[in-house]
A protein has these predicted regions:
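Short beta-strand His + acidic residue motifs that chelate non-heme Fe in jelly-roll/DSBH
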Residues: 58-60, 78-79, 100, 106-114, ...
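Bacterial Sec-dependent signal peptides at the C-terminal "C-region" and cleavage site
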Residues: 12-29
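Ligand-binding loop in jelly-roll beta-barrel domains
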Residues: 103-127, 204-226
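Glycine- and acidic-residue-biased ligand/ion/polar-headgroup-sensing regions
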Residues: 64-83, 167-186
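Bacterial N-terminal signal peptides that target proteins for export
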Residues: 1-9
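A short glycine-rich, His/Asp/Glu-containing loop-to-beta-strand
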Residues: 33-59, 64-69, 135-163, 169-172, ...
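Short acidic-glycine-tyrosine-enriched beta hairpin
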Residues: 83-103, 188-204
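Surface-exposed beta-loop interaction hotspot
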Residues: 108-156
């Protein structure tokens, strides 16, 4: 029999590897990732603002439902899947959108801000997928997944969208700050001073126009449930 002390190096290495393995952080649900700041939760969706300072990384986290991401700032970021190398940087600018279909195949990843600016994104997690999706559209569709459609309006000062109707609940998001004027078919109107990242959830049928009553270009995103 070999002396017991000949096994010590192997035992130490196995113990070290086991400790390293057990100390590796497990992925967390997206709403528990500390850079994802929860702003709204209801039966239909979660709205989170994701903020990473230059050089910061998120934790590994899991997206398990369809989602929409809306960029609010200029950024350069990578993503990394577990046990995979970091991706090449992706450049983004305000108003860019990303729609993913994840209910059948959840995504686990982490994000690394490799740019000089703030990584600033609204992440909208769509909690329900309709059994009978609406076929009515409110305007030109900028993107869609099985849970929602996205409309993007870029408004020069004084410009107005066509009158359009949201048959389904929707989320309206300000990409840029400007004076937004909303007008109903009866002529009743409301003007709001909005800031980048402001949003409003609407659960009733709405018909309106959107107008830029300010002096600079405005961008609005509408995420309408199907």
């Amino acid at each position: 029999m070999k002396p017991w002390f000949n096994l010590a190096p192997t035992f130490v290495l196995l113990t070290l590897f086991a400790a390293q393995e057990s100390s590796a952080p497990a992925p967390v649900p997206v709403e528990q990732e500390p850079h994802h700041h929860l702003l709204l939760k209801n039966d239909y969706l979660l709205v989170m603002r994701v903020v990473l300072q230059p050089g910061e990384r998120s934790l590994y986290h899991v997206h398990s439902v369809d989602d929409v991401a809306v960029w609010l700032g200029n950024s350069s970021a990578t993503q990394q899947l577990p046990n995979e190398p970091e991706s090449a940087p992706a450049e983004q600018k305000p108003g860019n959108i990303s729609l993913r279909t994840l209910r059948e195949a959840p995504l686990t990843h982490r994000v690394h801000n490799v740019g000089q600016g703030l990584f600033d994104v609204l992440d909208v997690e769509l909690l329900q997928r309709p059994e009978h999706p609406s076929t009515a559209v409110a305007g030109p569709v900028a993107g869609e997944n099985p849970s929602a459609r996205v409309y993007k309006w870029t408004l020069a000062p004084g410009s107005v969208t066509p009158m359009h109707t949201h048959e389904r609940p929707y989320l309206i998001i300000a990409v840029t700050g400007f004076q937004l004027k909303m007008t109903a078919p009866d002529g009743q109107s409301f003007t709001h001073e909005i800031k980048p990242g402001d949003f409003h959830w609407v659960s009733t049928k709405v018909t309106h126009t959107l107008a830029n009553a300010g002096n600079g270009e405005g961008q609005i995103i509408e995420i309408e449930l199907k």
